[in-house]
A protein has these predicted regions:
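Short helix-capping segments at alpha-helix termini
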Residues: 96-100, 152, 221-228, 253, ...
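Hydrophobic alpha-helical
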Residues: 132-148, 217, 234-293
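Flexible loop/hinge segments that line or gate small-molecule binding clefts
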Residues: 140-178, 291-299, 303
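An alpha-beta-alpha
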Residues: 183-224, 330-338
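Hinge/cleft segment of the Venus flytrap/periplasmic-binding protein
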Residues: 221, 310-338
Length: 338
């Protein structure tokens, strides 16, 4: 290998080939991880790349090969404004990325149904798709399906709710434990010295984001507001009709409910319930996701605070992560923080 005494401001693959003393074809094979190159030669090429400070122009390389990225999002199929906003962001970004050789699509599957989610993952055409972003529960069947995607060379991102025990490449979403802690701080301050009970609405105990929010919520309520009793989670499955039916009985069974924490995104049933009932002393309410419905409820005093995450940021971040992983480029972690 030739010593590098020259300064290369913008090194090219020709420079790599010259310094490593190999052919351009060999450099191309190494850069694209293709077979047929000896380990010793790969080491020489990688050493030349490091010494020259070569940074691959992935966009130019993809354009030269006519490559198109194909990314699929799997979303829950529930009646939920937050999920609908994610879908709308996918549609809009798909239009914006047409010039960037990137195609986005989505699949909707039954919410909180791990078998349906696994079936949707398994149905993906591995030969046509580069990456998959999954918003769904963490179960053994889902982990197995993700492992199958990885075995076929696809990039996998968990979206909103993490699936850490799987082989997923990255999680795009907020820190849900911290979100639960924030909800407890807000609700505790709203309630002050009042004694009573707090009801926790959740979508499903299968949903890791809901579980993590509950964990953070309980931690702060127990430490900072021990005079308030936190009730067991009421599972509404993000179904507005079910939530509207469950709330009257739950409030009748538990006297002196002074606060409600809605840890899921399905707030329609909660809002409908409060709009149709009168309270001498309405419970304070903290919810998740700023949507047209929750914004109106905030303005009307039905909801007292909303903890939000930006749907557009979530989708854009998922796409950036999947592209970076496919191109083997480093991530800007600060940019992907939701």
């Amino acid at each position: 290998m030739k010593p590098t005494t020259e300064t290369y401001l913008n090194p090219t693959i020709n420079d790599i080939a010259r310094v490593a003393e190999v052919s351009l074809a060999t450099v191309d094979r190494v850069l694209n991880a293709r077979p047929g190159v000896r380990e010793k030669t790969i080491s020489k090429v990688n050493k030349a790349i490091a010494e020259l400070g070569y940074v691959r122009d992935a966009a130019a390389a993809n354009l030269a090969r006519g490559r198109v990225y194909n990314f699929v999002f799997i979303l829950p199929a529930n009646d939920n404004e937050f999920v609908s906003s994610l879908q709308a962001q996918i549609d809009q970004l798909n239009i914006n990325l047409r010039h960037d050789r990137t195609v986005l699509s989505f699949v909707r599957v039954a919410a909180f149904d791990p078998m349906a989610l696994s079936a949707a993952i398994n149905a993906i055409d591995k030969s046509q798709v580069d990456g998959v972003a999954i918003f769904g529960p963490e179960t053994p069947s889902v982990r197995d399906s993700i492992a199958h995607l990885k075995a076929n060379g696809l990039t996998v991102v968990s979206l909103v709710a993490d699936i850490p025990s799987s082989e997923r490449d990255y999680c795009v979403g907020i820190d849900n434990v911290a979100a639960g802690r924030t909800a407890a701080q807000l609700l505790g301050r709203f309630l002050g010295k009042k004694r009573g009970k707090v009801m926790v609405l959740t979508g499903s105990m299968l949903a890791r984001d809901h579980l993590e929010r509950r964990l953070g919520f309980d931690e702060v309520m127990g430490q900072d507001f021990p005079h308030i009793d936190v009730l067991a989670s009421l599972e509404g499955r993000d179904d507005p009709d079910l939530i509207e039916r469950l709330l009257p009985d739950a409030l009748a069974e538990n006297s002196n409910v002074i606060g409600i924490y809605s840890s899921a995104a399905g707030n329609e049933g909660l809002v409908r319930f409060f709009n149709s009932h009168n309270f001498d002393d309405k419970p304070a309410v903290v919810a998740h996701e700023l949507t047209p419905l929750s914004r109106t409820a905030l303005n009307n005093g039905v909801i007292d605070a909303v903890i939000s995450q930006d749907p557009g940021h979530l989708i854009r971040s998922a796409v950036r992560v999947m592209r970076a992983k496919r191109d083997q480029r480093p991530l800007n972690s600060a940019q992907e923080r939701i």
